[in-house]
Amino acid sequence: YADGVSPPQRALKELISGTIFAVSENQSRPVHTGCRFEVTETDITVVAVDGYRLALRRFHFEEAAGRVMTFVAPGAALKEVEKILGDTDEEARFTLGSKHLMFQIGEATLVCRLLEGEFLDWRRVLPTENPIKLTANVEQLNASIERVSLIVSERLKSPVRCVFSDNSADFKTVTTIGAAHDVCSVAGDGKNLEIGFNCRYLLDALKAVPAQEVTLELSNGLSPIVLTPTDGSDQFAYMVLPVRLKESM
């Protein structure tokens, strides 16, 4: 356990809570049931993927930490670590062994086995050249999608149909129990782009955004939507894959 990194507890907590919801529950690819940590001398990037979405959070050290490491930590262990971490600037240390990872948080020590396997090449998957960029208030957008998702359930899994036009986002969904429609104002022109989403994935991403406003990056109706910071920083990225829409909605 020679290689150690000591971010503030608050930062590590945000890295975990901002990604853990997107880990896969599918045991056929065990490596994706954990979060990938990429530690450089200047920052820590944490990524989770589950086949339908991607969550990324990044923390920049105030001064170079001097350690470089990449590993995948199990989601179950990270949930326990998240519970122990406080909202404080006190350090939380994690050190990498050959097959294990050790967290030291205050008086607590937690050791977990690393996940092995080929983690998704997320840099190749995350689209960066998205021609449509819209800015939205996170709370308003969240409320709009929540209202139309009231008639969606595990059993009635209808996608939400979104139409992004000039300064507005129009949400509709239809299930066997009814129809719902809501409009949210956004800044920018969506060029009448129509796209379908699993509303739970979009809501999970919005709830994890650590800001009051967010940029929605879009390309076309069959490409993912990416939520990024409005200030152009690389602090977070949330990608959700679209759902094909039936014409009748």
Where are these regions (language model features)?
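Structural preference for solvent-exposed beta-strand-turn elements
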Residues: 1-249
